[in-house]
Amino acid sequence: MDIRKEFLNYFASKAHTIYPSAPLVPEDPTLLFTNAGMVPFKKIFTGEMPAEVPRATSCQTCIRAGGKHNDLENVGYTARHHTFFEMLGNFSFGDYFKEEAIAYAWEFVTEVLELPVEKLWVTVHESDDEAEKIWQKFVKKDRIKRFGDKDNFWQMGDTGPCGPCSEIFYDQGEEHFKGPEDYLGGDGDRFLEIWNLVFMQYERNEAGELLPLPKPSIDTGMGLERITAIKEGVLSNYDSSLFMPLIDAISDLSKKKYIYKEGASFRVIADHIRAVTFLLSQGVMFSNEGRGYVLRRILRRGVRHGYLLGLKEPFMYRLADKVAEIMGGHYSYLYEKLSTVKEQIRAEEERFYQTIEAGMRLFEEELAKTKTIFSGDVAFKLYDTYGFPLDLTEDMLREKGLRLDKERFETLMQEQRQRAKAAWKGSGDVALSGDFKELLGLKNEFVGYEKLKAHTIITGLLDESFKKCESLKPGQKGWILLEETPFYAESGGQIGDRGEIRLYEGEKIAKVLDTKKFFDLNMSLVEAIKEVKKDEAVEAVVDKSRREIAKHHSATHILHSALRKILGEHVTQQGSLVEANRLRFDFSHPKPLNAQEIERIENFVNEVIAQGIEAKVEEMPIDKAKEKGAMALFGEKYGDVVRVVEFGDVSVELCGGTHVKNSAEIGSFFITKESGVSSGVRRIEAVCGMSAVKLAKSWRESLVKASEEVKNKDILLGIKKLKDEIKDLKQEIKNISSVSAKELASQEINGVRVVIDEVDAGDIKKIIDDLKNAHEKLAVMLFQKRGEKVLIAAGAKGVKLKAGDWVKSVAPVVGGGGGGRPDFAQAGGKNPEKIGEAKKAALEYAKEHL
């Protein structure tokens, strides 16, 4: 049974609109990832946005591996925890309530899924008589249990929408679970919660009071992995058809049989490859911060567990095919992005295998110092810096008969958790509070595509703290809402417009510093010059720099096409910034661009500019736009009707930004820099229009200055002459400072060539290496003054004397210390006047140990 499909079809038959899964990177700036089915509808539940439809249903992909909701460390060791999962849900936005929600849930569970009624139990909130009364129409009273706020009351935060909830439980059988926690409401696995119905009927105010909502709503959630396992009659999510093909593939790769009790590593890898494949397919990239860092941790945890299974080379990228095979029927983009995703995973795996080897060296070094208890600090460093899981470290110690200072490790882990908790402040910068609700519904039309000036009315005013006000005094900053606005709000990488607000007579009353979008409201940040009043008739004037912004925005579209044509279809936009004087474009590509590729890309864009291609801007249904081949950004929210910007057959993109009317207006295009952003993501920075002219002028000035510096009109010839002079001088210095190994004082002791001497200049290590090459048995120690200090270096070959011990013995004579390997060691000292004594000490030590 395709439960996902059955669920969506069932609720579609009940007049629910099917919504596709929203991106894993949410619009909500307080969340790291989409972690529940209701996240895409949060603004509707809070009243910040009107509902487009009264009823909705979805199968939402979710991640819980960072921020507040973090299941990462439990994954693999329980039957239910996952980093990636799918949440089935049905939602009512002020339409139906408890009666229908309960009836729908019961009908789906018993008639569509055909779960046996005798296995089902229900819980309600201890105060919810209404819900219990409705449930009694379907189940016996003794199968309905009441619980308190901890189990059966849901709220979004300290304030806001909230309400009691009702949960449906499935009894997996006493024959399988007989532990002390295996009762309804306990922590055991016998009674599994399969569906949570939230009755959003209150709003909690800042005083903590519960106020009835005028239009109560419904939010439900059922985990697909859990209900699939129940329907298939298995006791663990990992034994279901969603995971077993992956576990079988891991078994084939590792040549190890999967046994449930010993199979945590199999389960970790199976779970993590799903999360990694989906996140990469949706445009999240490996990095050292934010979402990219969580992605990196998930992959590396999977690799570490592969290491436990004996997989010592990249393997996870091979499993991405299986993820696409299992889930690509519903999420077609998994197939579309598969080859790029596999490249990205493999590159990250290769990078981590180098780290594992470095970690093993640290482990071996600490092991040599350990008698019974291994350092918790080193174990934490292995975990935190080198990505070693605690169980891997403990397994290696167990083989050596050693124990770990686990208490110290846990202390450091707790400190890290506290730091991470304090550091996580969300990922966006929009206002999370304020009087925006007061402005919703007011007319706010963007007219900036057609004109840069507009006669309009200030319909709303907020101060800098986003609180409603009637006016702004001179010098005061605040946000204005205009009935018609020519100011473009920051979006799609294009910065927000600046400009002026004038009275009709022409008097300037405010500077527009920026324009942003809050909850679909185009609002401009202003600084008042004169008093700015609500409901005042004004003229809004966009700064002339907008024309330069438009040039750079159009150039990014053409650049995107150039990259896909020259580098390959795997290139997708990962981010952009469009300003008046520059552009920045991030794109997926596994390696740096060479000079030839950069030149080809630059030439392509300039050829399109020279062709003078007319820009065609048209609004059309999104399906038609996709048929035309319009490129859309994964994760961007598009309506049923979209704006398409075309430059002939060169570029077709969905875009709400401002553009030139003809490619010739861009003028010229120069790439100023190509660099890496993170693993698999490159960045191009470029200029066009007047910025390109200014750049060319600055280059010309630099060339003139360079010509003067090298005293040659032909700069390249002048540089070549300077390089030749430097080369000759370096050779002279080398000739002066080199010391012949034959000139050094040496003697033979017990058949071993012993060299102990002071050298004035030269590379000590090279001299020692030359001596080693010349002798089968050698002990050498050299001293060299370096200002007020002294450097000692020693080498040994074919003898029992150890250079590290020799240096440790002699260094204190010159007031220093050091050490190293048996074959080479170094030390430093602060008393160069005692080199003579040190040479004698070195000779005595050599006689004693040779």
Swiss-Prot record:
Highest taxon listed in the record's lineage: Bacteria
Binding positions for Zn(2+) per the UniProt entry: 553, 557, 655, 659
Cofactor binding: number and manner: Binds 1 zinc ion per subunit.
Subcellular location per the Swiss-Prot or TrEMBL entry: Cytoplasm
Protein name, UniProt field: Alanine--tRNA ligase
Chief location: cytoplasm
A cellular component annotation (GO) from this entry: cytosol
Pfam family, one: tRNA_SAD
Reactions that this protein is recorded to catalyse: tRNA(Ala) + L-alanine + ATP = L-alanyl-tRNA(Ala) + AMP + diphosphate
Gene name for this UniProt entry: alaS
GO biological process: one example: negative regulation of DNA-templated transcription
E.C. code: 6.1.1.7
Organism: Nitratiruptor sp. (strain SB155-2)
Cofactors: Zn(2+)
Primary role: Catalyzes the attachment of alanine to tRNA(Ala) in a two-step reaction: alanine is first activated by ATP to form Ala-AMP and then transferred to the acceptor end of tRNA(Ala). Also edits incorrectly charged Ser-tRNA(Ala) and Gly-tRNA(Ala) via its editing domain.
